[in-house]
């Protein structure tokens, strides 16, 4: 059969005091949305946060990472309370001139931090899905990653960062 899902984040907005960084909105209405969607029989929900790598600006900042991942963890816990499978999406944005090494370091930092937050909020990882991107150089970098490099770096980051208990 087919499963139904819904996007629950309210979009990305500028993170006050952090030039060029964003934060996801929507926690304020999450509970009532989950009540409604639970009654409708929704199976899963997705929430996206995004991080831009910019070495000159120092992004993503620790503050932006922490704030966004805490929101993802709160969302995931709330979904599970209503029997809805949460899909967590901490996206590292492809645009920019970052190297594959910078992407690897940032992606690994974000994923490790995400799973710490999910643990703090007692999110059941067996009932959670991670939507992640590939580890690769930014679209504006002169040296683009080969498919072999992308595969190797992505798999290594996932092995080092993602607990075995995660569902998907």
PLM regions: where:
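Glycine-rich, proline-tolerant flexible connector loops at the mouths of alpha/beta enzymes
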Residues: 17-18, 49-63, 92-98, 139
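Alpha/beta catalytic barrel-like cores
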Residues: 1-42, 53, 147, 153, ...
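Glycine-rich anion/phosphate-binding loops
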Residues: 19-35, 60-75, 109
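Acidic, His- and aromatic-enriched active-site or binding-groove loops in soluble protein domains
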Residues: 4, 65-76, 104-119, 149-156
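Conserved, mostly hydrophobic/aromatic
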Residues: 47, 88, 130
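Short, well-ordered coil/turn segments that N-cap beta-strands
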Residues: 1-4, 40-43, 80-86, 119-128, ...
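Short glycine/threonine-rich loop-to-helix capping motif typified by GTGT followed
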Residues: 59-60, 97-107, 136-150
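Catalytic-face loop-and-helix region of soluble metabolic enzyme cores
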Residues: 122-123, 133-168
């Amino acid at each position: 059969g087919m499963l139904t899902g819904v996007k629950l984040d309210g979009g990305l907005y500028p993170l006050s005091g952090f030039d060029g960084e964003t934060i996801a909105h929507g926690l304020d209405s999450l509970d009532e949305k989950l009540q409604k969607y639970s009654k409708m029989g929704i199976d899963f929900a997705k929430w996206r946060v995004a991080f831009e790598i910019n070495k000159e600006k120092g992004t993503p900042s620790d503050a932006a990472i922490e704030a966004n991942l805490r929101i993802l963890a709160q969302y995931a816990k709330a979904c599970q309370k209503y029997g809805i499978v949460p899909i967590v999406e901490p996206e590292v944005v492809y645009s920019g001139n970052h190297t594959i090494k910078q992407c690897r370091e940032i992606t690994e930092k974000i994923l490790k931090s995400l799973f710490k937050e999910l643990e703090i909020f007692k999110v059941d990882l067996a009932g959670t899905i991670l939507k992640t991107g590939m580890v690769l150089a930014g679209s504006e970098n002169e040296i683009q990653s080969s498919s072999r490099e992308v595969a190797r770096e992505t798999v290594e980051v996932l092995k080092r960062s993602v607990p075995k208990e995660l569902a998907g």
